């Protein structure tokens, strides 16, 4: 059986500083200083009972396990010197940023539709400064983490995300969060089009909709847009690069 060549870009003189992550469809080589974990929309809205997703009728039963796996991922990433970046989705309290009837977002956002169906919720869902908009308690950003607010599914649309990454020489993005098939996939696709190497940790994401939706995104990422790995493999791999005390 022939050896499998790892994907990913590394200059020859930098290979000794890199680690190789087991992934599908092939392993990928990552340099921790050129890698970021991107935490997508881990807000009360998407993962907590009483949040927008719950109120809109989606099943959030799997969110608790997703939170635990993301926490494990972030602990390992920070210990290895990997940058952590949070996306936080939402709009101003008057929903000007959400767009009016002339915007597709007005018609497709389930948060906006839920508030139109239930006027008593107006101003409570995904509005900046509300409980719904806040990052969940278990995954609060730590010193050194970066927070990128966004107003649409992709974290690259009308944000400074690309500039944040290029200023730090980051080429590899490891995606975790909710929802696999919406904001995670949208952001990973845009990362691909901007020449970033995208990895999705399949057991640190959660979908909205039937279970086959999760597998559809896994297939899309693995076959067309990036690489798919697991939390345990990521943690074991980056621990090889964790700084040691003198």
UniProtKB/Swiss-Prot annotation:
| Descriptive protein name | Ureidoacrylate amidohydrolase RutB
Organism, by scientific name, is: Rhizobium rhizogenes (strain K84 / ATCC BAA-868)
Q: Name one GO biological process term.
A: uracil catabolic process
Quickly give the catalysed reaction: (Z)-3-ureidoacrylate + H2O + H(+) = (Z)-3-aminoacrylate + NH4(+) + CO2; (Z)-3-ureidoacrylate + H2O = (Z)-3-aminoacrylate + carbamate + H(+); (Z)-2-methylureidoacrylate + H2O + H(+) = (Z)-2-methylaminoacrylate + NH4(+) + CO2
Q: Name one GO molecular function term.
A: hydrolase activity, acting on carbon-nitrogen (but not peptide) bonds, in linear amides
Q: EC class of this enzyme?
A: hydrolase
Quote the SUPFAM superfamilies the UniProt record gives: Isochorismatase-like hydrolases
The text of the family note is: Belongs to the isochorismatase family. RutB subfamily.
Query: What EC number(s) is this enzyme filed under?
Result: 3.5.1.110
């Amino acid at each position: 059986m022939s050896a499998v060549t790892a994907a990913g870009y590394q200059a020859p003189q930098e290979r000794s500083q890199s680690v190789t992550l087991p992934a599908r469809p092939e392993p990928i080589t990552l340099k921790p200083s050129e890698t970021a974990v991107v935490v997508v929309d881990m807000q009360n809205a998407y993962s907590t009972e009483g949040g927008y997703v719950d109120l809109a009728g989606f099943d959030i039963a799997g969110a608790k396990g997703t939170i635990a796996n993301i926490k494990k991922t972030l602990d390992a990433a920070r210990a290895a010197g990997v940058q952590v970046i949070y996306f936080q989705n939402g709009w101003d309290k008057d929903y000007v940023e959400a767009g009016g009837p002339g915007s597709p977002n007005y018609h497709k956002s389930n948060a906006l539709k839920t508030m139109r169906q239930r006027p008593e919720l107006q101003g409570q869902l995904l509005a900046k400064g509300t409980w719904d908009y806040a990052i969940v308690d278990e995954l609060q950003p730590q010193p050194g983490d970066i927070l990128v607010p966004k107003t649409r599914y992709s974290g690259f649309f009308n944000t400074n995300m690309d500039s944040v990454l290029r200023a730090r020489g980051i080429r590899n993005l490891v995606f975790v969060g909710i929802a696999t098939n919406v904001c995670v996939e949208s952001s990973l696709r845009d990362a691909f089009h901007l020449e970033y190497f995208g990895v999705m940790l399949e057991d640190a994401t959660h979908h909205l909709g039937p279970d086959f939706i999760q597998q559809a995104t896994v297939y899309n990422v693995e076959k067309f847009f990036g690489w798919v790995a697991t939390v345990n493999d990521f943690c074991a791999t980056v621990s090889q690069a964790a700084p040691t005390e003198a």
